[in-house]
UniProtKB/Swiss-Prot annotation:
Belongs to the tRNA pseudouridine synthase TruA family. The active site is at 52 (nucleophile). One of its GO terms (biological process) is tRNA pseudouridine synthesis. It comes from Cupriavidus taiwanensis (strain DSM 17343 / BCRC 17206 / CCUG 44338 / CIP 107171 / LMG 19424 / R1) (Ralstonia taiwanensis (strain LMG 19424)). One of its GO terms (molecular function) is tRNA pseudouridine(38-40) synthase activity. This is tRNA pseudouridine synthase A.
Length: 272
């Protein structure tokens, strides 16, 4: 039996999230259907991070076990031939059985693209979040950065956890939150050991509330310490959220994600 790691991009706007569901309009269902058509047998996939409906991925990682022997590029080209245009494998890598897409990951990274202009932009519909402000108004990005600083380190993130979250522990380590201001756009990068269900979207809701001056930056620390979801802002829209990277031990040379063909081209190139 051979274990293969696969890298996946997808535009999540048209799908009901990653995880397989009875109606079968999920990324996992489309991917496993395509793999079955390529391999001639149903193969189950294990994913690094399950994404919600409307959430995208530039660096999703999965693994599967198979007796089929093919060159890595044959997996990419062959499976992609049966996938819808909004889902595509980017690479394939043979790994040993010690590799696990979910449990071996020690860091995950999400980006969020937020448009703050006075009107919608149809060309990025479904691919960016919105906080439409009147002409001349801007989010207070410095206040957002000050609020985000309270999130760094190991914390109980229960205040930002969805009620249906199945994680065994709400304690996670946030390594970095980087916020870039670019005209009508605000781009955010979150790096953590792992994320709870809806955690990034709930953090976004709070950061935007601070950016709109509804709360001071220290409010974020109060919400975090309160460990109560009711204290935080409403869950922000999924449209601008992207899973961009998953890190593994050096023994597994998983390719880094390439955001160059997305809204994030060049945005975080100089970020540590």
């Amino acid at each position: 039996m051979n274990r293969i790691a696969l890298g996946l991009h997808y535009d999540g706007a048209a799908f009901s999230g990653w995880q397989s569901q009875p109606h079968r309009n999920t990324v996992q269902d489309h991917l496993e259907d395509a793999i079955e058509r390529f391999a001639g047998v149903r193969l189950l996939t294990t994913v690094a991070g399950r994404t919600d409906a409307g959430v995208h991925a530039l660096g999703q990682v999965i693994h599967l076990d198979t007796e089929l022997v093919r060159e890595p590029f044959s997996w990419v080209r062959g499976v992609n031939a049966f996938l819808p245009p909004s889902i595509a494998l980017q690479w394939a890598l043979p790994v040993d059985v010690g590799f696990h897409a979910r449990f071996l990951a020690y860091e995950r990274m999400y980006y969020y693209a937020l448009y703050t202009g006075p009107h919608r932009v149809p060309m990025v519909h479904g691919r960016a979040g919105y906080q439409m402000l009147p002409p001349g108004q801007r989010l207070d990005v410095e206040a957002m950065r000050a609020a985000a600083a309270h999130l760094i380190g190991e914390h109980d993130f229960s205040a930002f956890r969805a009620a249906e979250c199945q994680a065994k522990s709400p304690v996670k380590t946030m390594y970095d939150v980087t916020i870039r201001d670019d005209g009508n756009w605000v781009f955010l990068r979150f790096r953590a050991s792992a994320f709870l269900h809806h955690m990034v979207r709930n953090l976004m809701g709070c950061l935007v509330a601070v950016g709109r001056r509804r709360y001071p930056p220290d409010w974020m620390a109060q919400v975090l310490a309160g460990r109560d979801r009711k204290l935080a802002a409403p869950t922000f829209m999924p449209d601008g959220l992207y899973l961009v990277g998953v890190k593994y031990p050096d023994a597994y040379p998983i390719p880094a994600a390439d955001p160059s063909a997305s809204l994030f081209h060049g945005v975080f190139d100089d970020a540590a």
